[in-house]
Amino acid sequence: MNWDEQLVVAAVAALTPVADGDFRTVGAAIRGVDGAIYTGVNLFHFTGGPCAEMVALANAGGVQVVRIVAVGDQGRGVVSPCGRCRQVLLDLAPGVEVMLPGGTTAPVEELLPQGYHWSEGL
């Protein structure tokens, strides 16, 4: 697995102009199989607003995703995806490489062992 510094830079660039410390605190970047980078920023809300990873995934418009990273505001650097994002990635981007704090990466399946697969039904 490879560290993709361009993705980190893109996630920071997406977040920096809109980070407000309250509602927009995480940026994400995705690399598609086409090589393009798609970004997103979270929109926190008590009703469960979208995470940055989900916004970036939506912005990719169905392109197959190969790698993803999320970064926190206020210099927090790379952050791990939450459980909901891990589940969404497992279902919509199986095999995606997730960049993690400390310069490591892992396939999403390793971040959600014995996870439920939506495609298998209940």
Place the predicted regions along the sequence by residue.
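Short, charged low-complexity linear segments at domain edges
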Residues: C51-V69
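A general structural motif
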Residues: A19-V26, P50
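C-terminal binding/interaction regions
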Residues: M1-G21, I37, V41, V63-L122
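Compact, glycine-rich, soluble single-domain proteins
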Residues: V41-M54
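Short beta-strand scaffold segments in enzyme catalytic cores
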Residues: T25-V33
